[in-house]
Amino acid sequence: MSQVRDTPVKLFGWTITPVSHDPYSSSSHVLPDSSSSSSSSSLSLRPHMMNNQSVTDNTSLKLSSNLNNESKETSENSDDQHSEITTITSEEEKTTELKKPDKILPCPRCNSADTKFCYYNNYNVNQPRHFCRKCQRYWTAGGSMRIVPVGSGRRKNKGWVSSDQYLHITSEDTDNYNSSSTKILSFESSDSLVTERPKHQSNEVKINAEPVSQEPNNFQGLLPPQASPVSPPWPYQYPPNPSFYHMPVYWGCAIPVWSTLDTSTCLGKRTRDETSHETVKESKNAFERTSLLLESQSIKNETSMATNNHVWYPVPMTREKTQEFSFFSNGAETKSSNNRFVPETYLNLQANPAAMARSMNFRESI
Protein backbone atom coordinates (compact mmCIF):
# COMPACT_ATOMS: atom_id res chain seq x y z
CA MET A 1 0.00 0.00 0.00
CA SER A 2 1.48 3.19 -1.07
CA GLN A 3 1.78 5.88 1.46
CA VAL A 4 0.42 9.31 0.47
CA ARG A 5 2.57 12.18 1.66
CA ASP A 6 1.59 15.85 1.98
CA THR A 7 3.37 18.43 -0.06
CA PRO A 8 5.90 20.63 1.79
CA VAL A 9 4.77 24.10 2.92
CA LYS A 10 6.86 27.32 2.56
CA LEU A 11 6.59 29.67 5.50
CA PHE A 12 8.77 32.81 5.81
CA GLY A 13 11.20 31.38 3.33
CA TRP A 14 11.40 28.02 5.01
CA THR A 15 10.06 24.82 3.52
CA ILE A 16 8.25 22.61 6.04
CA THR A 17 7.72 18.97 5.14
CA PRO A 18 5.01 16.99 7.05
CA VAL A 19 6.08 13.96 9.11
CA SER A 20 4.74 10.58 7.91
CA HIS A 21 2.63 9.03 10.72
CA ASP A 22 0.63 5.76 10.53
CA PRO A 23 -2.10 5.60 13.20
CA TYR A 24 -3.03 2.01 12.49
CA SER A 25 0.39 0.69 13.16
CA SER A 26 0.69 2.52 16.41
CA SER A 27 -2.72 1.47 17.67
CA SER A 28 -2.71 -2.13 16.54
CA HIS A 29 0.72 -3.04 17.61
CA VAL A 30 1.31 -2.46 21.30
CA LEU A 31 4.67 -3.73 22.34
CA PRO A 32 5.64 -4.30 25.88
CA ASP A 33 9.02 -2.68 25.51
CA SER A 34 8.25 0.97 25.14
CA SER A 35 11.87 1.82 25.01
CA SER A 36 12.49 -0.12 21.88
CA SER A 37 9.54 1.52 20.18
CA SER A 38 10.66 5.00 21.13
CA SER A 39 14.18 4.39 19.92
CA SER A 40 12.97 3.07 16.64
CA SER A 41 10.72 6.11 16.15
CA SER A 42 13.55 8.50 16.88
CA LEU A 43 15.77 6.70 14.45
CA SER A 44 13.10 6.94 11.82
CA LEU A 45 12.65 10.71 12.39
CA ARG A 46 16.34 11.68 12.14
CA PRO A 47 16.81 11.37 8.41
CA HIS A 48 13.71 13.49 7.80
CA MET A 49 15.08 16.27 10.00
CA MET A 50 18.42 16.20 8.28
CA ASN A 51 16.75 16.44 4.94
CA ASN A 52 14.68 19.43 6.10
CA GLN A 53 17.77 21.29 7.36
CA SER A 54 19.67 20.71 4.15
CA VAL A 55 16.71 21.94 2.14
CA THR A 56 16.35 25.08 4.24
CA ASP A 57 20.06 25.75 3.97
CA ASN A 58 19.94 25.46 0.24
CA THR A 59 16.95 27.75 0.00
CA SER A 60 18.58 30.35 2.23
CA LEU A 61 21.73 30.26 0.14
CA LYS A 62 19.68 30.66 -2.99
CA LEU A 63 17.76 33.55 -1.49
CA SER A 64 20.92 35.31 -0.35
CA SER A 65 22.53 34.78 -3.71
CA ASN A 66 19.45 36.16 -5.39
CA LEU A 67 19.43 39.19 -3.13
CA ASN A 68 23.12 39.78 -3.76
CA ASN A 69 22.61 39.52 -7.45
CA GLU A 70 19.71 41.96 -7.32
CA SER A 71 21.70 44.47 -5.26
CA LYS A 72 24.62 44.14 -7.64
CA GLU A 73 22.34 44.69 -10.57
CA THR A 74 20.73 47.75 -8.96
CA SER A 75 24.14 49.17 -8.06
CA GLU A 76 25.37 48.52 -11.55
CA ASN A 77 22.27 50.16 -12.95
CA SER A 78 22.69 53.19 -10.68
CA ASP A 79 26.35 53.41 -11.61
CA ASP A 80 25.46 53.22 -15.23
CA GLN A 81 22.82 55.91 -14.80
CA HIS A 82 25.23 58.14 -12.89
CA SER A 83 27.92 57.65 -15.47
CA GLU A 84 25.40 58.42 -18.18
CA ILE A 85 24.34 61.60 -16.33
CA THR A 86 27.94 62.68 -15.86
CA THR A 87 28.72 62.02 -19.49
CA ILE A 88 25.64 63.95 -20.52
CA THR A 89 26.54 66.89 -18.28
CA SER A 90 30.14 66.82 -19.45
CA GLU A 91 28.95 66.78 -23.03
CA GLU A 92 26.59 69.64 -22.29
CA GLU A 93 29.39 71.54 -20.62
CA LYS A 94 31.57 70.88 -23.59
CA THR A 95 28.86 71.99 -25.91
CA THR A 96 27.95 74.98 -23.76
CA GLU A 97 31.55 75.78 -22.96
CA LEU A 98 32.02 79.55 -23.41
CA LYS A 99 33.86 79.64 -26.67
CA LYS A 100 35.00 82.82 -28.33
CA PRO A 101 32.77 83.88 -31.18
CA ASP A 102 34.25 83.62 -34.62
CA LYS A 103 32.70 86.82 -35.90
CA ILE A 104 34.32 90.16 -35.18
CA LEU A 105 31.61 92.66 -34.36
CA PRO A 106 32.24 96.31 -35.29
CA CYS A 107 32.08 98.94 -32.60
CA PRO A 108 28.58 100.50 -32.45
CA ARG A 109 30.11 103.83 -31.41
CA CYS A 110 32.89 104.41 -33.93
CA ASN A 111 32.17 101.57 -36.40
CA SER A 112 35.76 100.36 -36.25
CA ALA A 113 36.68 96.71 -36.70
CA ASP A 114 39.55 96.91 -34.22
CA THR A 115 37.62 95.10 -31.50
CA LYS A 116 38.18 92.03 -29.36
CA PHE A 117 36.03 89.60 -27.40
CA CYS A 118 36.49 89.74 -23.62
CA TYR A 119 34.01 87.47 -21.83
CA TYR A 120 30.37 86.51 -21.51
CA ASN A 121 28.30 88.62 -19.19
CA ASN A 122 26.99 86.47 -16.29
CA TYR A 123 28.14 83.37 -18.19
CA ASN A 124 25.39 83.96 -20.70
CA VAL A 125 26.16 83.05 -24.28
CA ASN A 126 23.65 85.61 -25.52
CA GLN A 127 25.53 88.49 -23.87
CA PRO A 128 29.11 88.56 -25.14
CA ARG A 129 31.20 91.47 -23.94
CA HIS A 130 33.45 93.18 -26.46
CA PHE A 131 36.07 95.90 -26.25
CA CYS A 132 36.95 98.56 -28.81
CA ARG A 133 40.62 99.50 -29.00
CA LYS A 134 39.96 102.72 -30.86
CA CYS A 135 37.51 104.45 -28.56
CA GLN A 136 38.52 102.44 -25.47
CA ARG A 137 34.97 101.35 -24.64
CA TYR A 138 33.21 98.14 -23.63
CA TRP A 139 29.85 97.02 -24.93
CA THR A 140 27.68 93.90 -24.87
CA ALA A 141 26.09 92.47 -27.97
CA GLY A 142 22.42 93.28 -27.81
CA GLY A 143 22.97 95.78 -25.00
CA SER A 144 23.69 99.47 -24.68
CA MET A 145 27.02 101.26 -24.96
CA ARG A 146 28.86 102.12 -21.78
CA ILE A 147 29.64 105.81 -21.45
CA VAL A 148 32.38 105.62 -18.84
CA PRO A 149 35.61 103.99 -20.04
CA VAL A 150 36.39 100.97 -17.88
CA GLY A 151 39.25 98.51 -17.88
CA SER A 152 42.75 98.43 -19.23
CA GLY A 153 44.06 100.48 -22.09
CA ARG A 154 45.41 103.99 -22.24
CA ARG A 155 42.62 106.51 -22.34
CA LYS A 156 43.10 109.55 -24.50
CA ASN A 157 41.38 111.88 -22.06
CA LYS A 158 43.24 110.53 -19.03
CA GLY A 159 44.29 113.12 -16.43
CA TRP A 160 44.20 116.90 -16.44
CA VAL A 161 45.70 119.14 -19.08
CA SER A 162 49.44 119.25 -18.61
CA SER A 163 51.31 122.48 -18.07
CA ASP A 164 52.70 122.57 -21.61
CA GLN A 165 49.23 122.86 -23.15
CA TYR A 166 48.41 126.39 -22.03
CA LEU A 167 46.93 128.73 -24.57
CA HIS A 168 49.19 131.42 -25.96
CA ILE A 169 47.37 134.71 -26.38
CA THR A 170 49.02 137.25 -28.66
CA SER A 171 48.14 140.70 -29.85
CA GLU A 172 46.52 139.28 -33.01
CA ASP A 173 43.84 137.54 -30.95
CA THR A 174 42.88 140.71 -29.16
CA ASP A 175 42.65 142.94 -32.24
CA ASN A 176 39.00 141.96 -32.66
CA TYR A 177 38.15 143.29 -29.22
CA ASN A 178 40.33 146.37 -29.08
CA SER A 179 41.48 148.46 -32.01
CA SER A 180 44.59 149.70 -30.24
CA SER A 181 47.59 147.36 -30.36
CA THR A 182 48.19 145.83 -26.96
CA LYS A 183 50.64 143.27 -25.69
CA ILE A 184 49.49 140.56 -23.35
CA LEU A 185 51.82 138.29 -21.47
CA SER A 186 51.82 134.70 -22.72
CA PHE A 187 52.38 131.95 -20.20
CA GLU A 188 54.41 129.05 -21.50
CA SER A 189 55.37 125.76 -19.95
CA SER A 190 58.08 125.49 -17.36
CA ASP A 191 60.23 123.47 -19.78
CA SER A 192 60.49 126.37 -22.20
CA LEU A 193 61.87 128.63 -19.50
CA VAL A 194 64.95 126.45 -19.08
CA THR A 195 67.72 127.46 -21.47
CA GLU A 196 71.32 126.41 -21.90
CA ARG A 197 72.74 129.80 -21.00
CA PRO A 198 72.86 130.16 -17.22
CA LYS A 199 73.36 133.92 -17.25
CA HIS A 200 71.46 136.67 -19.00
CA GLN A 201 73.40 139.44 -20.58
CA SER A 202 72.51 142.99 -19.87
CA ASN A 203 71.84 143.71 -23.54
CA GLU A 204 69.24 140.97 -23.91
CA VAL A 205 66.46 142.42 -21.79
CA LYS A 206 65.44 145.97 -22.53
CA ILE A 207 62.38 147.69 -21.14
CA ASN A 208 61.35 150.73 -23.17
CA ALA A 209 59.37 153.26 -21.19
CA GLU A 210 57.32 155.32 -23.58
CA PRO A 211 56.63 158.93 -22.65
CA VAL A 212 53.28 159.78 -21.19
CA SER A 213 52.55 162.50 -23.71
CA GLN A 214 52.24 160.00 -26.59
CA GLU A 215 49.30 158.19 -24.97
CA PRO A 216 47.21 160.78 -23.19
CA ASN A 217 43.94 158.84 -23.43
CA ASN A 218 44.88 155.18 -23.88
CA PHE A 219 46.71 153.67 -20.93
CA GLN A 220 48.20 150.62 -22.61
CA GLY A 221 51.34 150.31 -20.52
CA LEU A 222 52.19 147.14 -18.65
CA LEU A 223 53.92 146.50 -15.40
CA PRO A 224 57.42 145.02 -15.60
CA PRO A 225 57.51 141.21 -15.57
CA GLN A 226 57.64 139.68 -12.13
CA ALA A 227 58.53 136.23 -10.90
CA SER A 228 55.27 134.39 -10.49
CA PRO A 229 54.15 130.75 -10.83
CA VAL A 230 53.12 129.67 -14.28
CA SER A 231 49.36 129.69 -14.68
CA PRO A 232 46.99 129.83 -17.65
CA PRO A 233 45.85 133.28 -18.73
CA TRP A 234 42.41 134.57 -17.94
CA PRO A 235 40.09 133.58 -20.82
CA TYR A 236 38.38 136.98 -20.88
CA GLN A 237 39.89 140.21 -22.01
CA TYR A 238 40.93 142.54 -19.25
CA PRO A 239 42.38 146.05 -19.47
CA PRO A 240 46.08 146.31 -18.67
CA ASN A 241 47.33 148.21 -15.68
CA PRO A 242 47.90 151.91 -16.39
CA SER A 243 51.43 153.21 -16.16
CA PHE A 244 50.38 156.20 -14.06
CA TYR A 245 47.34 157.62 -12.34
CA HIS A 246 45.90 161.07 -12.78
CA MET A 247 45.90 163.27 -9.74
CA PRO A 248 42.53 164.86 -8.99
CA VAL A 249 42.11 168.53 -9.81
CA TYR A 250 39.88 170.73 -7.70
CA TRP A 251 38.96 174.24 -8.75
CA GLY A 252 41.92 174.64 -11.05
CA CYS A 253 44.56 173.50 -8.55
CA ALA A 254 46.33 170.17 -8.51
CA ILE A 255 46.89 168.14 -5.38
CA PRO A 256 50.40 166.69 -5.15
CA VAL A 257 51.31 163.15 -4.34
CA TRP A 258 50.75 162.05 -0.77
CA SER A 259 53.88 162.56 1.25
CA THR A 260 55.11 160.80 4.36
CA LEU A 261 53.49 163.28 6.72
CA ASP A 262 51.34 162.51 9.71
CA THR A 263 48.16 161.21 8.07
CA SER A 264 46.05 160.90 11.18
CA THR A 265 42.43 161.84 10.53
CA CYS A 266 41.79 163.35 13.94
CA LEU A 267 41.68 167.15 13.90
CA GLY A 268 42.30 169.60 16.68
CA LYS A 269 45.14 170.33 19.07
CA ARG A 270 48.19 168.08 19.24
CA THR A 271 50.97 167.78 21.72
CA ARG A 272 54.06 169.77 20.86
CA ASP A 273 57.12 167.56 21.06
CA GLU A 274 60.64 167.83 19.81
CA THR A 275 59.85 165.33 17.11
CA SER A 276 57.34 167.69 15.49
CA HIS A 277 60.12 170.07 14.39
CA GLU A 278 62.07 167.16 12.96
CA THR A 279 59.07 165.99 10.97
CA VAL A 280 58.58 169.51 9.64
CA LYS A 281 62.19 169.63 8.44
CA GLU A 282 61.93 166.22 6.84
CA SER A 283 58.74 167.20 5.05
CA LYS A 284 60.39 170.41 3.81
CA ASN A 285 63.30 168.44 2.40
CA ALA A 286 60.91 165.96 0.80
CA PHE A 287 59.00 168.78 -0.90
CA GLU A 288 62.25 170.27 -2.13
CA ARG A 289 63.36 166.96 -3.64
CA THR A 290 60.15 166.16 -5.48
CA SER A 291 58.91 167.89 -8.60
CA LEU A 292 55.67 169.83 -8.26
CA LEU A 293 53.21 170.96 -10.85
CA LEU A 294 52.94 174.73 -10.89
CA GLU A 295 50.29 176.84 -12.37
CA SER A 296 51.16 179.59 -14.84
CA GLN A 297 48.30 181.97 -15.26
CA SER A 298 48.22 184.43 -18.06
CA ILE A 299 46.46 187.25 -16.29
CA LYS A 300 45.23 189.91 -18.70
CA ASN A 301 42.91 191.68 -16.32
CA GLU A 302 42.29 191.36 -12.61
CA THR A 303 38.53 191.03 -13.20
CA SER A 304 38.85 188.01 -15.60
CA MET A 305 41.12 186.07 -13.26
CA ALA A 306 38.63 183.24 -12.57
CA THR A 307 37.76 182.66 -16.26
CA ASN A 308 41.31 182.24 -17.56
CA ASN A 309 42.60 178.89 -18.81
CA HIS A 310 45.20 177.13 -16.71
CA VAL A 311 48.20 175.42 -18.21
CA TRP A 312 50.17 172.85 -16.19
CA TYR A 313 53.83 172.02 -16.68
CA PRO A 314 56.38 170.25 -14.45
CA VAL A 315 59.15 172.37 -13.02
CA PRO A 316 61.96 170.97 -10.82
CA MET A 317 62.14 172.45 -7.36
CA THR A 318 65.06 174.48 -6.11
CA ARG A 319 65.53 176.48 -2.97
CA GLU A 320 65.09 179.82 -4.75
CA LYS A 321 62.01 178.75 -6.68
CA THR A 322 60.37 177.28 -3.65
CA GLN A 323 60.60 180.61 -1.91
CA GLU A 324 59.21 182.46 -4.94
CA PHE A 325 56.62 180.14 -6.49
CA SER A 326 55.66 177.42 -4.03
CA PHE A 327 52.16 178.43 -3.11
CA PHE A 328 51.57 175.15 -1.26
CA SER A 329 53.97 176.10 1.47
CA ASN A 330 52.83 179.72 1.42
CA GLY A 331 49.17 178.65 1.47
CA ALA A 332 49.56 177.47 5.02
CA GLU A 333 51.48 180.56 6.09
CA THR A 334 50.06 183.67 7.69
CA LYS A 335 51.55 187.08 8.32
CA SER A 336 52.04 186.28 11.94
CA SER A 337 53.78 182.90 11.28
CA ASN A 338 56.92 184.56 9.85
CA ASN A 339 57.29 182.11 6.86
CA ARG A 340 56.75 179.05 9.00
CA PHE A 341 55.43 175.83 7.39
CA VAL A 342 52.74 173.97 9.28
CA PRO A 343 51.86 170.52 7.81
CA GLU A 344 48.61 170.19 9.77
CA THR A 345 47.00 173.13 8.02
CA TYR A 346 48.17 171.85 4.66
CA LEU A 347 46.49 168.49 5.27
CA ASN A 348 43.29 170.18 6.33
CA LEU A 349 43.27 172.31 3.18
CA GLN A 350 44.02 169.27 1.07
CA ALA A 351 41.06 167.43 2.54
CA ASN A 352 38.74 170.37 1.77
CA PRO A 353 39.17 171.56 -1.84
CA ALA A 354 36.67 174.41 -1.45
CA ALA A 355 38.68 175.85 1.42
CA MET A 356 41.85 175.49 -0.64
CA ALA A 357 40.29 177.40 -3.54
CA ARG A 358 39.15 180.17 -1.20
CA SER A 359 42.61 180.38 0.37
CA MET A 360 44.23 180.65 -3.06
CA ASN A 361 41.88 183.43 -4.11
CA PHE A 362 42.60 185.16 -0.83
CA ARG A 363 46.37 184.90 -1.37
CA GLU A 364 46.12 186.20 -4.93
CA SER A 365 44.11 189.18 -3.80
CA ILE A 366 46.71 190.13 -1.19
From Swiss-Prot:
GO cellular component terms attached to this protein's record: nucleus
Dof-type zinc finger locations on the chain: 105-159
Biased composition (Low complexity): 25-45, 56-69
MF-aspect GO terms: DNA binding; DNA-binding transcription factor activity; zinc ion binding
Regions of compositional bias (Basic and acidic residues) in chain numbering: 70-83, 91-103
Sorted UniProt keywords: DNA-binding, Metal-binding, Nucleus, Transcription, Transcription regulation, Zinc, Zinc-finger
Organism superkingdom: Eukaryota
Residue segments, region Disordered: 22-103
Record-listed Zn(2+) binding positions: C107, C110, C132, C135
Main localization, broad class: nucleus
Intracellular or extracellular location(s): Nucleus
Disulphide bridges: none
PROSITE patterns, A to Z: ZF_DOF_1, ZF_DOF_2
Record's function text: Transcription factor that binds specifically to a 5'-AA[AG]G-3' consensus core sequence.
PANTHER family attached to this UniProt entry: CYCLIC DOF FACTOR 2, DOF ZINC FINGER PROTEIN DOF1.3
Protein name in the entry: Dof zinc finger protein DOF1.3
Naturally occurring in which organism (per UniProt): Arabidopsis thaliana
